[in-house]
Amino acid sequence: MSKKVVDVVSEMVQPILDGLQLELVDVEFVKEGQNWFLRVFIDSDKGVDIEECAKVSEALSEKLDEADPISQNYFLEVSSPGAERPLKKKADFEKALGKNVFMKTYEPIDGEKAFEGELTSFDGEIATVTVKIKTRKKEINIPYEKIANARLAVSFN
């Protein structure tokens, strides 16, 4: 059910975002405790502010009220993805080149399933992450299809 909701909401919100020159980062429909939350994460090259989130929230809320695709009561939240934005699409990886990232893989690569370091290259098929191991740097090549999830990672170095 929640996958269908995510797809329907993604299709509904895209024209709103196109009109405001914003990008859809992710949509989540999750139950936390007794409450359902519909979370829409938006961004742009310059970031997003509270006014843009409010515009998207109001426009999407109207569309959701008209179409009524969700049977449960829920809270709608529209926000930026934050500093540790998820990397969902290949274009997200391209934008993240030179930045610190955290990735988990479906299966071990060099005996590990979690990697944090600089995304030094991405050719659409292989993501290369330069990780620090004590005082050495090591390049890890991670096939795109083996990435379970990835996000930007804040570094305090």
UniProtKB/Swiss-Prot annotation:
InterPro entries: Ribosome_maturation_RimP, RimP_C, RimP_C_sf, RimP_N, RimP_N_sf
Keyword DNA repair: no
Pfam family, one: DUF150_C
Location in or out of the cell: Cytoplasm
Any single GO BP term: translation
Protein name: Ribosome maturation factor RimP
Signal peptide: none
Domain of life: Bacteria
Purpose of the protein: Required for maturation of 30S ribosomal subunits.
CDD domains attached to this UniProt entry: YlxS_C
GO CC terms, sorted: cytosol
Keywords: Cytoplasm, Ribosome biogenesis
Family in the record: Belongs to the RimP family.
